């Protein structure tokens, strides 16, 4: 699903209020054009199509909302699916604590550009680890 605006966060917030653990696996792509190509390929093979304006809205809206609301999720996994062969886990968090992260110098441009709060957490963790050495 998509959570490109505040209204779509009502469901995870409701579950959280009721005491459930809320997890998100976020699969990112490098740009909306890559998303368009994947949608076209899916539609060509019998899957559902999505209008280009919705693809763009989903692409940017999802990133904005993740950056703004990542603390809502008890568990968060961010995966780069830009490469069709091998996907890469970029970040794993549990209760806003980093369990795993890709080094900041290896993060894809889309992550750094659209997820500055998560990038800042990685940078802070790297700085902390470097000062402890």
Give the positions of each predicted feature.
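Residue-level signal for the start and early helices of compact helical domains
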Residues: 13, 46, 64-67, 101-102
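NTP-dependent small-molecule kinase module
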Residues: 68-133
